[in-house]
Amino acid sequence: MQNLVKEFIEKVLETNIVLEKPKDVSLGHYATPVAFSLAKELKKSPMLIAQELVTKLENPSLFEKIEAVNGFINFKLSPLFLQSLVDDALSNKENFAKQHKKSEKILLEYVSANPTGPLHIGHARGAIFGDSLARVGKYLGYDITTEYYINDAGSQMDLLGLSVNLAARDFIYGEDVSYPEVYYRGDYLIDIANQIIQDYGKDYLYDEKNFKDIALLGKDFVMNLIIKDLKDLGIEFDNFVSEKSLYSSWNETKRVLEENGSLYDKDDKTYLKSTQYGDDSDRVVVRDNGIPTYLAGDIIYHKNKYDRNFDRYINIWGADHHGYITRVKAAIEFLGNDSSKLEVLLSQMVQLLKGGEPYKMSKRKGNVILMSEITEEIGSDALRFIFLTKKSDTHLEFDIDTLKNQDSSNPIFYINYAHARINQVFVKAGVNFDDIKDISFEKLNQDGLNLVYESLLLESILVEAFAKRDMQKITEYLYNLASSIHKFYNEHKIIGSDEQNLYLKVLSIAALSIKVGLKLLGIEAKEIM
């Protein structure tokens, strides 16, 4: 809708314009300050230019009213233009608010949690954000590949093997053991141990020479758990990339960095000259024992990413990785690549409440709130929606009891109720699409036109949400649209009125916006409640 209006104005005026949406729809559906940008060139006041352009831009099939106000030009869309957009949408629902394929290829990496334990509630935020961002981007025509980086190299894997051994000795064999603070905790370790005993026998767990293999078996067990938990939230990845599988290319990567003069040795360690690109200090990439650091693994991975020739790379990291961005970008530059193609989005902490009090963590679950636990308690739809009600880089606090309420305090219930309400009106009225498809908006009242206009904003909301990497734009829009639907329903008699089918056509486009918007957030709109 916005693109059609913008293209018409630019064609008539033969110049690029900015098109804005006034906060008060009574002023118009769109406005442009183009007269201000033309004032210097035309040597006239913006007010005079705006008045002259109004006549030039008149188009009754597109605009019901064009008005110059203080140098701005306000446009009110015609009912018949809105009707044509609704007719197109309702006859081609699967493509509503969708855009054509774009040439830009994007690699989107998110979650990438260590395969040492199940996902917790903090991981869930990045997972839901990343999945929704991918869904919206793909719908808008971008070629997006989603990827999970498995951190299966380094000391955390050795620690996993030791933790499985200790958990087995404690809970299965009843030994008196003490847990070092750095060891992993949780019932999943016992599950791993039981699986190993079943497959290899109990003696296998006691033999120290098997600890590395135990760690690998544990990693596979945990990754299967992670994949299942993600799938329960409707999240699947195109690629899984193992850190360990990339380490064979470290020597080649190191050689390139050395040739670029980006490494130096000090105190038996090898450093990356990351301060040359704004880092606080140069970073160790090889320890004094000759083992590459965690940063070295990330350097290899990002080289691998760039070697695959995407146009843009998006990483979603936990907020605690903020300081890590500069050093990774420095390495990208040293490898001869363009670090501006890498965009790092941060996912902030989550504070979970229950009944107004902090949610209690279970020691048996490792003193974390498991993602699977909350998904089971409130459902994937509620969890997905609430996690997208705030921008990902801001703190999020919510009470899970609120998400069980059957009223407007529960946003996903409120939105779903609006959609189900419309569906049930059609059922009660005994009306189908053929009964309303030819209905004209010529006599539609202002309330109806406003609801139609709001419903048709979905595409521009999606474009803005993806461009700003802010899914909150969509959740806000859907909640406000649901509010408008409820208001319209409460203020206008529908079934049995003279305007019944006209109003049903209005509600049809509103329901379609709700359905498509929720789908792009990974949520299925309810038909009945």
Curated annotation (Swiss-Prot):
Keywords: Aminoacyl-tRNA synthetase, ATP-binding, Cytoplasm, Ligase, Nucleotide-binding, Protein biosynthesis. It is found in: Cytoplasm. InterPro entries: aa-tRNA-synth_I_CS, Arg-tRNA-ligase, Arg-tRNA-synth_N, Arg-tRNA-synth_N_sf, ArgRS_core, DALR_anticod-bd, Rossmann-like_a/b/a_fold, tRNAsynth_Ia_anticodon-bd. GO terms for cellular component: cytoplasm. A motif ('HIGH' region) lies at residues 113-123. GO terms for biological process: arginyl-tRNA aminoacylation. The keyword Nucleotide-binding applies. It catalyses: tRNA(Arg) + L-arginine + ATP = L-arginyl-tRNA(Arg) + AMP + diphosphate. It comes from the Bacteria. One of its GO terms (molecular function) is ATP binding. Its EC number is 6.1.1.19. It holds the Pfam family DALR_1. Belongs to the class-I aminoacyl-tRNA synthetase family. NCBIfam families: argS. Monomer. This is Arginine--tRNA ligase. It comes from Aliarcobacter butzleri (strain RM4018) (Arcobacter butzleri). The gene is argS.
